[in-house]
Amino acid sequence: LGTLAAVLRPINANIPNFDELSLPADQLMRWSQRSSGLVLICGPTGAGKSTTLAAILGQLNQTTQRHIITLENPIEYLFVPENCWFSQREIGTDTPSFAVGLRAALRQSPDIILLGEIRDSETAITALQASETGHLVLATLHSANTTDALERLTNLFPAAERNFALSLLASELLGIFSQKLLPSTKDTLIPAYEILSNEGAVSDWLRDLDLAAITEHVHRSGVDGNVSLLTCLAHLCAEELVTPEVAEAYCDRPGELRRLLRGIE
């Protein structure tokens, strides 16, 4: 008490790739190579969301020619142009808020906008409108899983704008990638993730905000590129990358995970 303290987060100067992070490159890049739409990277604080976004932009920098504007608080990774042109903006230094920075970015001819965090209704609506007008928006959101992300995002919208926002979300959302970092058997951290792709009937469920149907759809892993957290955790256990005890601690359906692991054994 009464003394100075600091919390330090070391940031690697090198942009990590998907293999180094044990992330599913195919799905993430399938979304990120689209010319427009909204991609949400979700998870709790410290789950590696910024690093996942950095890996996506690093891959795009090697393979495509795009103008990428980032809005971050704070800037973590510095991108060196290879094939892409980067304009990095820090909240509080270069622009007063995410919403103001996002509106300004739309006048700067971006192909891709990285939005460090969606925190309020103005930012959320503007992100959806940016997607609608031909931009790819990559954004983070604090949430426990894919359906929790949808609920939190929807709750940002005022009641009078909710139907309009849900209609935009149904047409512009490409997918949600939700992740958690788990202690692995190799004394490192490894991501466990859940994937929801906006394909098939998902857009109708989004328009009606039918979270029960979306949750059930996600748990049918393998359908339209979806992966449930349960399936991902079971795979990590089968590969002996995490222990069953750790997997259960991070699973929202531990009973189902135990039954699934018994089937694998």
Regions found by a protein language model. Give the residues of each.
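Short, flexible helix-loop junctions that flank or precede catalytic/ligand sites
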Residues: L1-E265
